[in-house]
From Swiss-Prot:
Pfam families: DUF167. The lineage of its organism: Bacteria, Pseudomonadati, Pseudomonadota, Alphaproteobacteria, Rickettsiales. GO terms for cellular component: cytoplasm. Gene3D superfamilies: YggU-like. SMART domains: DUF167. This is UPF0235 protein RP839. SUPFAM superfamilies: YggU-like.
């Protein structure tokens, strides 16, 4: 089984890779897809990828969906690309597993 995230137990932070599809009919988190041996969670966002609107939409949607504060979610890689790396701060690994396992099929 692939590791679907990287967790730092000292900082209580996690890195998750997402593959974003903008212009979606609805915001939706899909299952994982493997690209170049790296797992990405599929994410459809209604927002357009202009002037950071899609990135803001990603943060807002994930925070709401996963019941996290928006300030705890940060895009750290791929600001202008569909493949992104998300940093989640102040998260317990057990809660992270609960979130992630919902999307593993």
């Amino acid at each position: 089984m692939n590791k679907f995230y990287i967790y730092n137990s000292f900082k209580h932070e996690a890195l998750i890779n997402v593959k974003v599809k903008p212009y979606a009919k609805q915001n939706l988190i899909g299952n994982f897809v493997i690209i170049n041996n790296i797992p990405y969670i599929k994410l459809a966002i209604k927002a357009t990828p202009e002037q950071g609107k899609a990135n803001e939409g990603i943060i807002h949607y994930l925070a709401k969906e996963w019941e996290l504060s928006r300030s705890s979610i940060e895009i750290i890689k791929g600001h202008t690309h569909s493949l992104k790396t998300i940093l989640i701060k102040n998260i317990n690994e057990d809660y992270l597993n609960l979130i992630i396992n919902a999307y593993i099929k």
